[in-house]
Amino acid sequence: MSTAPGHTAVLTMELQRGVVGDLSTLAELRDAVADADLLASVRRLLSAARAVSIPVVHATVGWRSDRLGTPLVTPIARHLAGNPAQMLEGTPAVELDPAIGPDLDVDLISHRHHGMAPFTGTSLDALLRSMAVTRLVICGVSLNVGVLGAVIEAVGLGYEVSVPTDAVAGVPADYGAAVLRHSLAPLALLTTVDELSSLWRGAL
């Protein structure tokens, strides 16, 4: 498995102000992200990717105020829907967290209103294939649901996947570590931001 720059893209998962940042109502996840200094690690990863022209795609989520297009079919969705302001379209909560250093003149966005993972029912796969991407570096949150779902969907669609372990988080932390070891290690190359950055610099 290779993570060399050619045919590679970086995919961030839900690194938004209302998920991991100052407007998050998910206190345990927000604290885990802060404790791991995750956003700084992601910022370094994205900077390294852009330096070698690796595309960065941000998978984001937002809800309409009437919840149209957001089936409340899971316990977590029903719980979050109890907050009328939860991830409302057009509000600061859906913005990318500035701590990751998004470059909206260069980066791409794949937005959804439904589900827990980024591919199903979105144009993400078509977007990646239009850029001849065959390898993904997936980072963000959470190892509990979103990152795990993204990896499984990506592998099912034929992508090779790498996961930088210092650029993902789950709650509690020991469970996140178990997901990496027992669920993601059989599916993806586990690496680090520094390892990827060094590899990409060496490919120049």
Language model features: what each stretch is:
Residues 54-61, 164:
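Short beta-strand segments at enzyme active-site cores
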Residues 25-34, 85:
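Short glycine-enriched, charge-decorated loop/helix-capping segments at active-site entrances
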Residues 37-55:
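A short, N-terminal amphipathic alpha-helix
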Residues 11-15:
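N-terminal nucleotide-binding beta1-loop-alpha1 segment
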Residues 1-9, 47-52, 69-70, 76-204:
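Active-site-adjacent betaalpha module
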Residues 31-38, 172:
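Residue-level preference for long, well-ordered alpha-helices that form the structural scaffold
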Residues 49, 59-64:
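N-terminal, charged amphipathic alpha-helical interaction modules
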Residues 16-21:
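Short acidic, Gly/Ser-rich segments with clustered Asp/Glu that frequently serve as metal-coordination loops
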